[in-house]
Design a protein with these regions (language model features):
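Carbohydrate-active catalytic/glycan-binding domains of CAZyme proteins
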Residues: 20-549
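Bacterial N-terminal signal peptides
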Residues: 7-15
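Positively charged n-region of N-terminal signal peptides that target proteins for export
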Residues: 1-4
């Protein structure tokens, strides 16, 4: 009787359980009819890796120098994903990553589950191999442990063998090591926390598969398998390598390529074997300024013992990507997407937000009034562009076409304090308000080649009267309530502003998006003041940030 009651109530309870889960207005891969459309993650989760634990799936991705780092996403069906946490609160050494270190830090992590614990390994190309652990992937992770010091070691992945021994595979960054396209394996201590063996080259793709990197190490039916990309980010392909010995030699086969599809460079990712006996492969697709989005492909083991990924005809040994396919078998019907909008009502930042460097509490904090306060941070004395500013609060772009609107109050104590919204990358553009005397100047701030020393320029668009003025005798502020908006379509961003939230005016010319260093363009907030400032800081109170069509 009890089971019958539960079975009757379950369809009613499931929507309630999912009520707190985020649904995107701009991209949802679940088609609602048992199929999905790629990408399953339409945002910059580059170099993805995933692990299955029972009927749950956990994914992480490269975070480079963005903080918090190592995002943790959860899914019940490999299609519907949500952000549940981060494994890295700050980058070490803290003082080095206290300022932006674009393109450095966490490269191509691997997530694994071993004896009741989750492990994430990654290579920092300037420092070595690191690992963090957790029993709950959505909870607290340990502080990073350095498994191996070294230069150029990237794209690391462990394997615990049947005899309890632990091995680590890695690729090499040519920019640091002076060579690439080589994969090496070495033995770790059984707990996986330190290297005890010397590296051996197990594969050199230099002549036939250039830019071999991003390896993931598995074992199946007595075979050791290396899944790795080759050919480069934009135009590469996916390899599978196998050997009866962990140290090789390995034979290689291409198992996924672009083929006749528009999906360039379908490679680097994770083989996932589900509790329902199915095999799937998650990989990225480079979309320039939008970053590297994540696709899901079916994977099949053929009679000759080799896998084929994606769509392949009879007798073909290499597949090409599906744009649409049936969903993996799952007991879950929940539709959920990674968070984008934020009302700032919960007392903590949404998990979609990251800083450009290790966070300083002086940069900002949530308020009891349901806002995110962002204080004007001191720009460096040698300021050229916001490429140097760690306090940018940013998130990934959620789709190719979307609108992002922020409602905020800017409060200024002194001249030349400024803040607003920004579309950030190696070229960037921001729509800001700056105090000048007793008024605010609406300005577009633009920079080309920020990564190579480009200098920010300012264009004043309008003069705006304050919404409110303090009457206190000590350090009075003037305040401006304003709505700022970005509309993105086809790689172009247009800016708008409004003082009432209903009537928006265009603010300046169109801006062409450009990616950051190894990451896609990002959007969010900026709040700054000159390095010479000595008085009280100004601030943004961001009431909300909403992503819509």
């Amino acid at each position: 009787m009890f089971r019958k009651i539960i079975s009757l109530l379950l369809p009613l309870l499931l929507p309630l359980a999912a009520a707190g889960q985020y649904r995107s207005e701009v991209w949802c891969p679940d088609n609602g009819n048992g199929t999905y459309s790629n990408p399953v993650l339409n945002a910059d989760y580059s170099d993805p890796d995933a692990v299955a634990v029972g009927e749950d799936y956990y994914l992480t991705a490269s975070s480079f120098s963005c903080i918090p780092g190592l995002p943790i996403l959860h899914s019940r069906d490999l299609v519907n994903w949500e952000i549940v946490g981060h494994a890295l609160k700050e980058q070490l050494p803290r003082e080095v990553f206290g300022s932006p270190q674009h393109g450095k830090g966490v490269w191509a992590p691997a997530i694994r589950f071993h004896e009741g614990e989750f492990y994430i390994y990654w290579g920092d190309p300037d420092r070595g191999v690191f690992v963090v652990k957790a029993t709950d992937p959505a909870g607290e992770w340990t502080a990073p442990v350095c498994v191996l010091e070294g230069k150029g070691i990237i794209d690391t992945c462990p394997l615990w063998d049947d005899d309890g021994k632990c091995y680590l595979i890695n690729a090499w960054a040519g920019s640091r090591a002076g060579f690439n396209s080589v994969l090496t394996i070495r033995e770790l201590s059984p707990d996986g926390l330190r290297a005890i063996g010397s590296p051996r080259i197990v594969y050199d793709g230099g002549q036939t598969n250039h830019t071999t990197e991003g390896p993931k190490l598995y074992k199946r039916d007595g075979w050791y398998w290396i899944f790795c990309p080759a050919g480069g980010v934009q135009r590469g392909w996916q390899l599978a390598l196998r050997s009866r010995s962990i140290f090789g030699p390995y034979e290689a086969r291409t198992v996924l390529f672009q083929g006749s599809t528009p999906v360039n460079g379908p490679h680097q990712g994770a083989w996932v074997h589900t509790a329902f006996g199915e095999d799937w492969f998650l990989h990225f697709n480079d979309r320039g300024a939008y970053g590297r989005v994540v696709f899901l492909q079916p994977m099949e083991w053929k009679g000759d013992g080799w896998p084929v990924i994606g769509k392949a005809g009879k007798g073909e040994t290499c597949g090409e990507p599906y744009l649409k396919f049936r969903k993996p078998q799952s007991a879950s019907a929940a539709v959920v997407n990674p968070a984008e909008s934020d009302e700032f009502d919960g007392g903590t930042l949404g998990l979609q937000w990251q800083w450009q460097a290790n966070c300083d509490e002086l940069w900002g904090m949530p308020t009891a009034g349901g806002c995110m306060r962002l204080y004007t941070a001191d720009l460096p004395e040698d300021f050229r562009s916001l490429w140097q500013a760690g306090n940018l609060l940013l998130q990934k772009l959620p789709a190719q076409d979307f609108t992002a609107t922020a409602k905020l109050r800017f409060s200024s104590k002194e001249d030349d304090q400024w803040g607003g919204i920004i579309m950030m990358g190696m070229n960037y553009s921001a729509l800001t308000v700056r105090r000048r005397g007793d008024v605010f100047l609406l300005q577009r701030l633009d920079c080309k080649g920020a990564d190579t020393g480009g200098v920010q320029t300012e264009t004043t668009l309008a003069s705006l009267q304050p919404t409110e003025r303090d009457t206190i005798p000590y350090s009075p502020a003037i305040h401006l309530d304003i709505y700022l908006r970005m509309k993105v379509s086809g790689g172009t961003c247009r800016f708008f502003y409004s003082t009432d939230g209903r009537h928006f005016r265009e603010a300046g010319s169109d801006f062409t998006l450009r990616q950051g260093k190894w990451i896609g363009a990002k959007m969010g907030f900026v709040s700054e003041r000159p390095s010479s400032s000595k008085g009280n800081r100004g601030w943004i109170d961001a009431d909300w940030f909403r992503v819509t069509r």
